[in-house]
Regions:
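Transmembrane beta-strand segments of Gram-negative outer membrane beta-barrel proteins
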Residues: 9-19
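A short acidic, helix-capping loop that chelates divalent metal ions and anchors anionic groups
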Residues: 25-27, 64-67, 101-105
Length: 440
């Protein structure tokens, strides 16, 4: 059963938003709590609707809904899900947006991780059978890389073997959680969002690494999709770093094919690799005026993966002119590739409100606001709120609230969402590559 009102949007393009929702309970980090969305979810969801977004990426927090093995607490989810359904907004539900419960041990490096994720998926699908769209795992490649290879996030491991181990577990979690959902809702649809990047080598030594990274960006989608056979360019690399042939065979026999590929793309998503003074590889963001650009990356991802594309995360941290320039550029490039027949079916500004402490990679508490949203966050001392204020102050336990302040970028966004897609992103040209392809 779909929410009332869903289906009124144009069938081949949607404007979307969401709320940054990463959690790392091992260090007490919870972005929805830092931004106070966990308290003010109702007014935030109404702001998303007012911004013209009838489809929204919305996450649950695994450690909150599943506080102990096989124990469930849906009190933080029931209200938002009920409101979304009442408003006729369609959620694409993030079941695992980084962060596993403390009781889950080593998380993505644990052999039982896929089973735990499947339990979560089944429990959610049983409770909310009307939900149709799912993201079982947000950025599974990034989760594997940051948790298993670079040590940036829990479980803080390093090296290619731990990366491949995490990759296998996370990809299997996608497959098993998706199978669990489809048992309960056979017509459910899946969108996995992951990094949309490109590496440019500036010297000969960097060329090999750039080539590897430009192959690796497709790796997670192709692994859980059962597409890695003997002729895959990274098959030998995977086996050399611990992937068993039996693992690859399992994925080919139990694929989780996507309905939509989610592209997470920002101004810093193209890289320049060069050799530093001590022989180390240096990775920096490529200047915008030298980038291939979103249109070319869409062509590459569609040619490789052959599925409809959605900008599942995008935005430009900074002031309003920076955000508006990025949005205008992205819309122009989406119009270009849709005119070529590349099925780009949505843009998601991430997130609707500013973030807190994302500048630290959510590794340290500084309570610093990162200017990423269409609504700016500003600290207010609620103790001095005028008693006659028309709206009650949204306060936290310390007497402070984060006020949501509309920006000029929001007004630009709303002009796009209010207009016909034919006049903004243009019609999707028919082609042999998208013929008969299910979009929304």
């Amino acid at each position: 059963v779909s929410p009332p009102g869903v289906g009124a949007e144009p069938i081949d393009f949607r404007w979307m938003t969401g709320f940054e929702c990463s959690t790392f309970p091992q260090i007490g980090m919870d972005e929805l709590a830092l931004t106070q969305h966990d308290r003010f979810w109702g007014s935030d969801i109404l702001r998303a609707l007012d911004a013209g977004c009838r489809t929204i990426r919305y996450a649950i927090r695994w450690h909150v809904v599943n506080p102990a093995p096989q124990a469930w607490d849906w009190s933080s989810v029931d209200g938002p899900m009920e409101l979304l359904r009442h408003l006729g907004m369609e959620p694409i539900v993030d079941l695992f947006h980084f962060g596993v419960p403390v009781w889950a041990g080593t998380g993505v490096l644990s052999s039982i991780f896929p089973d735990l994720q499947a339990e979560l998926a089944a429990a959610f699908a049983r409770r909310y059978p009307w939900v149709r769209w799912y993201t079982p795992t947000n950025e599974p490649y990034i989760m594997s890389q940051f948790g298993g290879e670079t040590g940036a996030w829990y479980p803080y491991e390093h090296g290619p073997r731990n990366f491949v181990r995490a990759l296998r577990n996370v990809a299997r979690g996608v497959c098993e959680s998706w199978a669990a959902i489809r048992e309960i809702r056979p017509d459910a649809r899946m969108m996995i969002s992951d990094t949309c990047e490109y590496w440019h080598a500036l010297d000969e030594r960097a060329e090999q690494r750039a080539a590897l990274m430009n192959e690796r960006r497709f790796l997670m989608h192709e692994l859980h999709g059962g597409r890695i056979g003997d002729d895959h360019p990274l098959r030998d690399w995977l086996v050399r770093h611990g992937m068993e042939e039996a693992d690859l065979a399992w994925f080919r026999e139990n694929p989780a094919e996507l309905d939509v590929i989610g592209l997470d793309h920002y101004p810093h998503s193209e890289h320049e690799l060069s050799t530093g003074p001590r022989g180390e590889l240096v990775d920096v963001a490529r200047p915008l005026d030298r980038q291939l650009g979103p249109a070319e990356l869409c062509r590459q991802y569609f040619a490789r993966l052959g599925r409809p594309l959605l900008f599942a995360e995008t935005g430009a941290p900074g002031d309003d002119p920076t955000k508006i320039a990025w949005l205008d550029r992205l819309v122009d490039e989406v119009r270009t590739v849709r005119g070529e027949g590349v099925p780009v079916i949505g843009i998601t500004w991430w997130g609707l409100i500013d973030q807190v402490d994302w500048g630290t990679g959510l590794r340290r508490f500084r309570y610093e606001i990162d200017p990423t949203g269409l609504y700016a966050l500003e600290w207010r001392d609620a103790r001095y709120e005028p008693a006659e204020a028309p709206d009650p102050p949204e306060v936290d336990g310390r007497g402070y609230r984060l006020e949501r302040v509309p920006t000029a970028a929001l007004e630009t966004w709303k002009r796009y969402t209010a207009a016909s897609p034919e006049t903004t992103v243009g019609p999707l040209a028919s082609s042999s590559t998208n013929e008969g392809m299910a979009l929304w």
